[in-house]
């Protein structure tokens, strides 16, 4: 007979170990909980967080695959499994995962639908299927027209092809409006002006991008 307090104590102890930076010991505790009580979603989530933090891709795949069986209505496991496959360059597996995930996301969860379509767009772009990539980005923006990652990526990819530059400029402008201090989005905006031959605005925004880039050495 299982004592629920055993898993509760292990959960608390595991969380304490995480706070102390003892990730291996914490991982061991959470793994024990998932074996004692496979339906303990919180323990699986902690395990997944540790695997993501340490970029242990095979472990992310193991956890997400098992959690898909245990929690078939939880789209987050499809999301991270897709990312893991993408990291391994298993693009078809990633696509299949996101498309399966879309099936279980309620229509009302427009933000998550948008994120999944954004990921699908990124995969198609990676395998150089531009029409499908742009179709997926359009779907993403249909669900959430303020999906800033999609707005930026879509705008940037269009500008690289020198295609639909006015649309690219509009999307990039919105990304910058939503996150005015994001150097990546400012850089994209500058690049689009540069491609269009508007060097004055390109210079203004590239300087702004550099001023906001905290990664550069002083």
Predicted regions: what they are:
Residues 15, 49, 83, 122, ...:
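Residue-level recognition of tetratricopeptide repeat
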Residues 19, 53-54, 87, 119, ...:
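Register position in tetratricopeptide repeats
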């Amino acid at each position: 007979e299982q004592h629920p307090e055993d898993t509760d104590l292990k959960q608390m102890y595991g969380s304490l170990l995480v706070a102390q930076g003892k990730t291996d010991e914490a991982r061991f505790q959470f793994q024990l909980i998932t074996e004692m009580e496979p339906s303990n979603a919180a323990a699986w989530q902690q395990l997944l967080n540790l695997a993501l933090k340490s970029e242990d891709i095979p472990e992310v795949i193991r956890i997400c695959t098992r959690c898909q069986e245990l929690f078939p209505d939880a789209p987050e496991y499809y999301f991270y499994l897709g990312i893991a496959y993408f990291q391994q360059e298993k693009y078809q597996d990633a696509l299949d995962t996101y498309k399966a995930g879309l099936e279980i996301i309620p229509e009302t969860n427009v933000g998550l639908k948008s994120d999944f379509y954004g990921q699908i767009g990124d995969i198609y772009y990676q395998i150089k299927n531009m029409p499908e990539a742009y179709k997926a980005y359009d779907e993403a923006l249909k669900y959430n027209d303020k999906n800033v990652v999609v707005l930026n990526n879509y705008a940037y990819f269009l500008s690289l092809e020198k295609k639909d530059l006015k649309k690219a400029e509009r999307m990039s402008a919105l990304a910058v409006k939503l996150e005015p201090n994001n150097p990546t989005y400012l850089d994209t905006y500058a690049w689009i002006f540069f491609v269009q031959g508007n060097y004055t605005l390109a210079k203004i925004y590239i300087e702004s991008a550099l001023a906001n880039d905290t990664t550069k050495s002083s």
